[in-house]
Amino acid sequence: MTPLIFVTGGVVSSLGKGIAAASLASILEARGLKVTMMKLDPYINVDPGTMSPFQHGEVYVTDDGAETDLDLGHYERYVRTRLSRKNSVTTGRIYENVIRKERRGDYLGATVQVIPHITDEIRRCIDEATAGFDVALIEIGGTVGDIESLPFLEAIRQVRTERGAEKAMFMHLTLVPYIAAAGELKTKPTQHSVKELRSIGIQPDVLLCRSEQAVPDSERRKIALFTNVSERAVISCPDIDVLYGMPLELLRQGLDELVIVQFKLRDKVAAADLSEWAAVVDAVKHPLDEVTIAVVGKYVDHQDAYKSVAEALRHGGLRQRTKVNLKWLEAQDLERSDMAALQDIDGILVPGGFGDRGFEGKVQTSKFAREHKVPYFGICYGMQAAVVDYARHVADLDAANSTENDRQSPHPVIGLITEWRTATGEVEKRDEKSDLGGTMRLGLQEQRLKPGTLARELYGKDVVAERHRHRYEFNNRYRTQLEDAGLVISGKSMDDTLVEVVELPRDTHPWFLACQAHPEFLSTPRDGHPLFIGFVRAAREKKAGGKLLKEARA
């Protein structure tokens, strides 16, 4: 039976439960434990796949094609375990499962209720996702006191009652606000948050106190007294300059030891080696170079919509001790501009998106980068924009477009994928009338790279696998025509049916590459991703006015 750490949040949302949980997980992993993580989200959507990026932020995709909460991106950036559909569960999915069972007659005519049927299904999902691991951390979305979270809190209360403290731990993240006028940290919100938890039968074992500054020992003692939590289990989580330094901070305060002692794991663990995280923090704090990258997107007012892209760019810089400054530009604004915003930029990245709003701005951005020899990296919709640009302005295919935006285009160089093969070898089909949810080409897919190309050089191997999330694809009818016009197709699906990567010859452009997949989902601060590392290096070379003499390594 896997020991479980349940992480809840109080007072306000967005305190950083995911980062705190992932940081603890990284320490436990460094001590030799096999760790997994899970997110329980209280919203009624089955998954976030059809939710607006402005409301929910990024949709993070796992190897098996699950469309999940962006917190799973945090988890995978901090731990080595690759997550799956099992690790992201919503209220909508729980109810969908229960209703399906009721329709099948699995409940034998019983009245289906929140307790026990909904809570039992939550517990079943927890058991399924965490089996076979030494420790599992489970984040409960939302804030204690929200009506939506109650079934999840009841379910984890039942787990603790049945398994005991040696197999289930409650960790509560709460706000300790600093009142500048009084010059004091206030503990009352934390006391009330714990009181709310205790009213539903949950007594926290550990408190993580988020604040602008370190919580002094006197306040920690006060919090411990009023919340019935051991003083050594009241952990200070102040604001820090580098989020990737959180594992080092939590290790310093001994949070991992609390887990080891409560779960009696002493015989399984070694000393924690966080040298990789120390190197990451050092590279962030002491860069040797600096570049500015323009990110031309549709949802730039809500930058969480591109969370993994932003992090992957920074990871690419970390690997060469380079600070990456991001300049966020709204694609729609560029449609009516002279592209002055792209002057003095070291590199341009156009990320994914859906719909026609801002697409012409992305096409014009590709054209600008191509003509002005600015390093260009297109991802998903950014690749499609690059293909449309090349078709219109180089291959002379007037009015070329994607059928997503213009179904009457005389040259639909980007079209709907009607059939493709999944990672398991099964054939999936869809058409214009298919549901939006869960009908895309999703998950990890292999592709073969063309020898002698930039993509092949960056990856360093012939076959690679990347995660996908898209409905539209390069139209194969235009392959020959665009290749004859000079476009290089450097990556294709293993069955040669889908174009995965396009680029420009290096004798015509220093660095112009676009891919249909989402490589940002496989980038981590400790390893980076070859495409992002190569892109940042190209930006450095543009800034330096030529080839770099030597590589700086983190």
From Swiss-Prot:
Binding site for UTP: 13, 186-191, 222
A GO molecular-function descriptor: CTP synthase activity
Activity modulation: Allosterically activated by GTP, when glutamine is the substrate; GTP has no effect on the reaction when ammonia is the substrate. The allosteric effector GTP functions by stabilizing the protein conformation that binds the tetrahedral intermediate(s) formed during glutamine hydrolysis. Inhibited by the product CTP, via allosteric rather than competitive inhibition.
Residues involved in Mg(2+) binding: 71, 139
UniProtKB keywords: ATP-binding, Glutamine amidotransferase, Ligase, Magnesium, Metal-binding, Nucleotide-binding, Pyrimidine biosynthesis
Cystines in this chain: none
Domain Glutamine amidotransferase type-1: 292-545
Protein family: Belongs to the CTP synthase family.
Protein purpose: Catalyzes the ATP-dependent amination of UTP to CTP with either L-glutamine or ammonia as the source of nitrogen. Regulates intracellular CTP levels through interactions with the four ribonucleotide triphosphates.
Subunit details: Homotetramer.
Name assigned to this protein: CTP synthase
Organism field: Xanthomonas oryzae pv. oryzae (strain KACC10331 / KXO85)
UniProt gene name: pyrG
